Amino acid sequence: MKSLMLVVLGNTEISTVPGISVAGATPELTKLTPPADAEYLFYEKPKIIDVIPVTPDGHPTPAIITKAARELANFPLMIVRGGTYLAPLVPHVHISDYVGRDFRKGPALQEAEEIIARARLFGEELSNTPIEELVIGESTPGGTTTAQAVLWALGYEARTSSAAPNNPQSLKEEVIKAGFERAGIKPGDFKEKPLEALKQFGDPMMAAVVGIALGFKGKVVLAGGTQMLAVAALLKALEEDMSRFMIATTKWVVNDRSATFIDTAKDIGIITYAADLDFSKSEFKGLRDYENGYVKEGVGAGGATWLAVKAGFSPEDVSRKVDELYRRLMELKAT
């Protein structure tokens, strides 16, 4: 089966709420994480900033897993700009430069339908190629909060994961409740109005992935953790046949006790795959800490591992390759 991997980039103002996202060394730097992640997949290090995206504690972006899987299995990969502050300095498909707004102050994404329409055209074009399967990952700091807001609006009692070991769940809920008050709704009020849920609380990555998935007629693997559950829930509410979709994530998301990944996936009715990566024997603390609940997923890490496994590599091969890439980064840093 011919597969193509897409990584959809998105930004939301929610990532700059202090304490909500660790997908960047500071809240302000989360604005640069999506293009930097995209660039790292193609170059030895990002162009837009001189460092690889890290958490405030120095844990490397999960793009390192996607890059490792790709170096092993050599699958084709394209970057899609769903809506970001800055364009990545790699060839990419431009859907929009709209950024998700802070939904406590007003609707998050008035342009949702425009983004879906453009992304749908792209999905339709991909259907005219020999590609039979899309594996769609994302890089969207703050996106687990927008995902949880959308899931709640659609009536799911979901808790999303976090790139931090201590999931800022109470802060997320406080932000979401403020957004619901602003919109004058209760959880579940947009069950029959998925596009309204997306407009009020979503982000441009979600809108772009929904559009691509609506336009493409083959199999779609949503490569991500709890953020892709929100995409799946939107697609289901839009009456898509869920049998052509699956979610590929990592064991770290599935094992996250603070989130409801498996239960929410069952509620939506989508099958899941969890990449059994193991960094416990890594020589680098930044990677070993993935086993302690840091980072967990992103940039399609689980889906990329799944593609490598389909190509005959093991999760152990991917884990070893990640170590090698991290070593290369350390050597670059030293020069």
From Swiss-Prot:
InterPro entries hit by this protein: Nict_dMeBzImd_PRibTrfase, Nict_dMeBzImd_PRibTrfase_arc, Nict_dMeBzImd_PRibTrfase_sf
Molecular function per GO: nicotinate-nucleotide-dimethylbenzimidazole phosphoribosyltransferase activity
A Pfam family per the record: DBI_PRT
Transmembrane segments: none
Domain of life: Archaea
UniProt cross-references to PANTHER family, sorted A to Z: PTHR38811, UPF0284 PROTEIN SLL1500
Similarity section: Belongs to the UPF0284 family.
Listed name of the protein: UPF0284 protein TON_0688
Lineage start: Archaea, Methanobacteriati, Methanobacteriota, Thermococci, Thermococcales
